Design a protein with these regions (language model features):
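Short beta-strand segments
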Residues: 52, 103-107, 186
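Short, well-structured alpha-helical segments in soluble
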Residues: 69, 90-95
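Hydrophobic or amphipathic alpha-helical targeting/insertion segments
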Residues: 99-109, 115
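Short acidic loop-to-helix transition motifs that present clustered carboxylates
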Residues: 80-89
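An N-terminal, well-structured beta->alpha segment
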Residues: 4-74, 79, 99, 152-183
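Gly/Ser/Thr-rich loops at beta-strand to alpha-helix junctions
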Residues: 54-61, 109-110, 189-193
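Gly/Ser/Thr-enriched, mixed-charge loops and adjacent short helices
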Residues: 11, 24, 114-201
Length: 201
């Protein structure tokens, strides 16, 4: 069974599988679900959340719905755009005031799938206890704030380059460069198209 599979329009058992919540886009994984998860994440993790996505067809739709949920409960949103999950995790860990993150991705699943993965303040995936609390708030519902308490959203640029720079700083780039390696890269339509070419160049 695929982690996060839905039964009868809602999950049987735990909402979160081994890698977040996953389902078929515009069926199980739809805008209403993403918006409600956004509200629940804002209620559990806090009011300053970073969000990123992969390049799947449904990712922009789901990211916007999730961000709407976050904003509606008073959470401020930092939109990193399309970057790999580790780049989001590093951003959450490095920047003071960021209390968590959400990645719109279904990893290696077929293209019709998408998913929502929650990141804790230390840059790791949320604990089971945090996921259980997010699910509890999802099921119970989270009330939106008044109009003058709605959160604010920002687009954050240069995240991919910052992530690449941090990786290069951890290796002997000159040694690799002098080796004269010839590398063939296939990003396979994934998020790494935003970072891997920069890294190899």
């Amino acid at each position: 069974m695929t982690p996060g599979r839905y039964v009868g329009g809602f999950m049987s058992g735990r909402m979160f599988g081994t890698n977040g919540v996953r389902g078929i886009s515009n069926k199980d994984m739809n805008c209403e679900l993403a918006m409600r998860i956004g509200r629940s994440v804002g209620a559990v993790l806090g009011k300053n959340i970073a969000v990123a996505m992969d390049p799947r067809t449904s990712s922009v739709m789901l990211k916007n719905a999730l961000c709407s949920g976050l904003l509606s409960v008073g959470a401020d949103v930092r939109d990193l755009g399309m970057v790999p999950t580790p780049a989001l995790q590093q951003f959450v860990k490095m920047y003071d005031g960021i209390v968590g993150g959400v990645m719109i991705t279904a990893s290696h699943n077929p293209p019709e799938f998408n998913g929502i993965k929650c990141i804790a303040a230390d840059g790791t995936e949320c604990t089971k206890e945090q996921e259980d609390e997010i699910e509890r708030r999802y099921r119970e519902g989270v009330e939106p704030v008044e109009w003058d308490s709605i959160g604010t959203g920002w687009n954050v640029g240069l995240v991919a380059q910052g992530y690449v720079d941090s990786v290069i700083a951890k290796v002997d780039a000159d040694c690799i460069r002098k080796a004269g390696l010839k590398v063939v890269l296939d990003c396979a339509n994934g998020c790494s198209c935003a970072t891997s070419p920069l890294l190899l160049q």
